[in-house]
Amino acid sequence: MSTNLEFARFPAPDGMNGWWESLPPATDARTVASESRFDWVVVGGGITGLCAARRLAELAPGASIALVEADRIGRTTAGRNSGFFVDLPHDISSESYSRSIEEDRADVRFQRHGIDYVRDIVRRFGIDCDWRDDGKFHASANKKGAAALAHFADGLTRIGEAFEWLDQAAIKAVTGTDFYTGALFTPGCSTVQPAALMRGLAATQPDNVTVFELSPVTLIEPRGDTRVLHFAGGTIVAKQVILCTNAYAATFGMHSNGLLPVYTFASLTRPMNADEVAKLGGTRSWAVIPADPMGTTVRRLITDRICVRNHFAFRPDVKVSAADLAKARHLHQRSFARRFPMLGGVELEYTWGGPLCLSANNGALFGKRADGLYEAIGCNGLGLSRGSSSGKLIAEYALGESNSLVQQLLKQPHPRPLPVRPLVDLAVSATIWAKEFSAGAEL
């Protein structure tokens, strides 16, 4: 089956991305402004697309490759997250924690594969993105959170992963706040400034990769044994196409009813002054994940800013409103004040949202579609680690390579179909509300 594929939704501003805004101005973007030909086109300049384009170039140095992004690389979704390369299975809320030892270990291998790939690139090219292999703290704020961490620890023990317990005094020595009652430290997580990383990955692509930004694809049209990609300013004719569009895949072609674009929101403070740094205490850089998945993620950055992330909203049109952003900012200010009462004069400078691509069964899309296009879509909340790994692996698969990780992705379930709108809107939004309410003090 080979039909036209139309694109209707593109990245929206969705607030002011503090990661992007706090960087020096970006260099001028190269846009699609004429007709050109490439062997491969990768659609989507997030972490998945950046890794897919690079891996294609590494394995096929004689091929011509275009990487096309609708906005600026680093300003949209991949540069809007909290900057965690998470290596472990993500859901710590359930008592059983994980499915099976074998499946969880496979997920760890998959996620670490992506982390290792990107870390090597950062080191080889000296990408300035505050990459840190300092691990993360899973912190609790009450007895319910402490119980969740105990279940998490049981799961880690079953799969043979290292961790360390911290009591209230120990986690306060790290964070400067006595808000947390205790924490569990896991060493395998890396953290970054995500917008800086995306810019750096784009700027260091191999010579046979051409990067186009501010160039949304409006239509992919089959023409003989090629594909014609249409843009406002021109066209690209390609032999093969890889889709790495994550949440935006929910708005086009073949799998849309199984994908859930769920926004999460973050705020970044202004830099603290010397007096404020002294009042806070703790260490210069740390990363805290809440014991409840719907709770508040907090990072202290080496720039003396603090990043706060919480609140979720199902937005199937892949954009948020001013009211969404205002609500998120209010929640962030409240969460910040509860954790850092000593920093009452520290303002939130930026607030923004970004879409996750979730599915009801943690399914994802990987491989060759019925229309002949390749795809790697659906990171289920672990965009940096899963996206980097699946991007690298889809390139290998498309070039005919196979390995245990490729086979693992080919066997994973597809996203489970959902009820029609507006039923799914009501169901997902109600579920989010209930889970946020249940998070309680963790928010």
Regions inferred by a protein language model and the residue ranges of each:
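Active-site substrate-recognition segment that forms the wall
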Residues: 124-132, 217-219, 235-275, 279-369
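Flavin (FAD/FMN) cofactor-binding and adjacent substrate-gating region
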Residues: 2-15, 21-22, 91-97, 119-200
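Glycine-rich active-site loop/strand segments that organize a redox cofactor
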Residues: 80-110
